[in-house]
Amino acid sequence: MFQSQKDGKKSAKGVILGYDLGHQFAQISYCTGDGAEPETVSAVTGTEQYNIPAVLCKRAGVGQWYYGKEAVKFAREEGGILVEDLLMLAQRGEDVMVEGEAFDPAALLALFVKRSLSLLNIRLSLYQVDALMFTVEELTPRMVDVLSRVAAGLQLKAKTICFQNHLESFYAYTLHQDEELRKNDVVIFEYNTSLRMLRLECNQRTSPMVVLIEQMEFPDVLRRVWAQEEQEREKQKQELDQLFAHTVRETLEEGIVSTIFLLGDGFKEGWAKESLKLLCRGRRVFQGNNLYSKGACYAMMERLNPSAEWKKHVYLGADKLKSNVGMKALRRGEDSYYAILDAGTNWYEAASDFDVILEEGNTVDFLITPLTGGGVMGRQVHLAGIPDRPRAATRLNIHVEMTAVNQASVTIEDLGFGELFPPSGKAWTATIQV
């Protein structure tokens, strides 16, 4: 439920969920919409085991399904049929055969998500959930389609369900940390199968402050299969420690890093000793694995009711609109700027529909203002064959919609002007570079 505040904003009265859906595990965090810090649901009551194995298990011969740790246990001890890689199967879209029966992979994924949400029952009712943010490693068009089907299958009462990638969750999480922790660059080292680094940089000289996130992969820093013999195992750990320390020196030698987050099960194996000392030199270092689900909560909180700090920043990721799109307009007799699309919006969500009065001429001019540098650029749409009418006697409906990260489709329709000048029925379509 939304409640109107005195300042006209809307705030979430209920609960916000952040759901991190991975190929191997899922995590669930939740918070109220009043700015409270998110909490993460444990897969085992009374522990900090946040990872929920993203698997299902079917009991042989009957239509009974188990999920998560219970599914793994039932498959191991009772001979159930284990279905793994649910996210990958849903992306492929091919039927999953279990005991000769075909199952829709998106429906199986929705079943897993629905069952996993039952972990919330001892804390809250799902009827209290107003908004849900899914976060995944990479948000492709196919992934959006899969998540949309999953969301529909959940049959939640939530008014808002959105999707974002891990980079956006990292950004949202960072902006909700103490300012001292994000005074300079913020880095994630993520170590599951192989090592990945994310580096968040903020240009504090721009308004709004532009945030960029650099990604680096280190395929040579792979998870180790530890030897049984203790001496050989210790040698493996020392070699990995040295390799990671070398990677840290190479990647962090430029710029200043305030904070480092170590994510992933690979950092839980007790090998990072000298490299950890190196990381801690003049930097704050945190270890955990629930950053993305918490970041998803924060992102949804900001989407519903943006904070003052959020409004000061704009994240320009790969899928984000890099420029503001607007036009000059006359308001109450004074020249002004009319904002159409805002930089920092996901390009596939960026659209605007509005009416204007054409003052004169037969063109509509747009202003493109890049936040990554460079001057303001003009884009013009020519209205061929528009009826000749007196000054300011033509009303136009304009629809602008992004069709790619740097391209917008513009549709303009002649609405005429009251009874004096009926609509001509003419419409114009153009593509502009943004």
Segment roles from a protein language model:
Residues 1-95, 152, 160-162, 169, ...:
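Early-domain small/polar-rich strand-loop-helix modules and first-structured segments
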Residues 1-14, 156-188, 291-309, 390:
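Conserved phosphate-binding catalytic cores of ATP/NTP-utilizing and phosphoryl-transfer enzymes
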Residues 11-12, 19-25, 180-196, 201-203, ...:
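A short acidic Gly-Thr/Ser loop motif
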Residues 42-133, 217-245, 250:
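Conserved phosphate-binding loops in N-terminal lobes of ATP-dependent enzymes
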Residues 107-175, 289:
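Active-site neighborhood for divalent-cation/phosphate handling
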Residues 132-144, 247-276, 288:
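Glycine-rich phosphate-binding loops at beta-strand->alpha-helix junctions
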Residues 142, 149-242:
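Small-residue (GG/TT-enriched) beta-loop-alpha framework at ligand/catalytic clefts
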Residues 298-385, 395:
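Acidic, glycine/GT-rich loop-and beta-edge segments that sit at the periphery of enzyme/chaperone cores
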